[in-house]
Amino acid sequence: MTPEEAYRWLAEHSLETAYLKSMGHLLGWDQRTHIPAKGHPHRHNQFAMLAKWIHARATDPRLGEALARVEASDLGTDPGAVTAVNVREWRRDYDRAVKIPQELAVALAKATAEGETAWERTRPASDWETFKPFLVTVVALKREEAQALGYAAEPYDAHLDLFEPGETAAGLAPLLEELRVSLLRVLEAVQGSGRRPQSEVVRRHFPVDGQERLAWLAAQSLGYDFAGGRLDPTAHPFSVDIGPGDVRITTRYNEHYFRQAFFGTLHETGHALYDQGLPAEHWGTPRGDTVSLGIHESQSRLWENLVGRSLGFWRFFYPRVQETFAVLQDVPLEVFHFAINEVKPSLIRTEADEVTYNLHILLRFELERALMNGDLQVAELPGAFNDKMCAYLGLTPPDPGQGVMQDVHWSAGLFGYFPTYTLGNLYAAQFYARAEAELGPLEERFAAGDFAPLLTWLRARIHSQGHRLWPRPLVREVTGEELTPQYLVRYLQRRFRALYGLPAGDF
């Protein structure tokens, strides 16, 4: 087999594996939106079978042989070329996969599917004791996985590197600490301002049918292609890339809280815009894939927060909201805009404001790092979670459902995932600042309903690039700088200085 033949075989193998993963994504979407209650056991078996097939393909010895042939040639000499990008990521995936025994891969697939189902069943009643054994199993298997994969400094790094290539806990912790200090200063200034929004205006009665129409309109306005997607209700909102021409979003409606579904929709739309902008001609290979969860999150946060919470956006969209909901016809734009940007520590991460959100992430980062490193046991988790909530946000969850059980991530085995939310916020602010430097002020365009220039900019610099670069190098290429918390901090200072009447200068 020549190097060229080996590369073609690798590309075909990658494409076939991508189809299997696509089937899993479709099954996962169905499980979280439409599956009948009695269908879960069979679905778990389906996931386990898919995991078995995918793992077998990922550890096929022929992959190693073909990679060796290509790597010994000049096909990968240009690090930016499509072939080099694909070979780099195939090698990374293969080396990771062969370290995980098939039995462990299958056990993890089944345990996480069962764990997520158990979470959905027990969370409404805050039934920690029933849920706990499922989480114990998942944590034990994830610890075993970290040992199988290996790591440079600590077990947690093995999981963090999966979601954010090149990132380590030691490299991330200083960024989070610098951000934490700045966020607490902003929070202190806001709480000391004495100015408070009329928060009740977003807690009036908003019938679901009206919210559905607005969610659809908002997603379409930002550029989401409904001919290649759909919007459905779910318990825990997500987006999913089934494949080219099929990128779906979901949201969760609350008739008495406007922000939940609307901003959840903007968030998932941001994810979907990234997936819809990937180069379809490279689908099934790394060059056509996303960079990382953090970069993915940067796209959702950028559209949800930097765009969707801006005054410019609401100058365009608020008249449509008032047309839909008569209960807001007596509420001026500025009052509504202040209400949707209220800063107030909350129990629920997904309902947190922009200032306190990353404090939620920091405590989860510290807890899951301790869990994976063996410094914290599952039985100790509820108490540890409550202690950190009190220390960072001044709140104590009254029950596990509003505390340690509020997120699906750990039951699904997604350790190392939470930090990507904060990385996404950091990336988003830095990308947005660069976009404005190149395009000029964007809020004036938003007020006119013109979101295309920003989307086009993101398409060219991020979406179309696929997995050509890892996160930190991509940030350097797009912005010309290393990743820094300062852009996020400055953005938050500007926004909340205006809303809360704070003095000029840093705080």
Region locations from a protein language model:
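Active-site recognition of the HExxH zinc-binding catalytic motif
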Residues: 260-280, 297-301
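A well-structured
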Residues: 1-165, 468, 493-505
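Post-HExxH zinc-binding segment in Zn-dependent metallohydrolases
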Residues: 289-333
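Acidic/polar loop patches that form or flank catalytic/metal-binding clefts of enzymes
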Residues: 227-228, 280-285, 309-319, 378-379, ...
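C-terminal, non-catalytic "cap/extension" segments appended to globular domains
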Residues: 2-6, 22-28, 38, 42, ...
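Secondary-structure capping and boundary motifs in well-ordered enzyme cores
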Residues: 42, 104-107, 134-137, 175, ...
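Contiguous, non-catalytic segments that form substrate-binding/exosite surfaces or channel walls
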Residues: 108-258
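Divalent metal-coordination and catalytic microenvironments
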Residues: 10, 150, 267, 300, ...
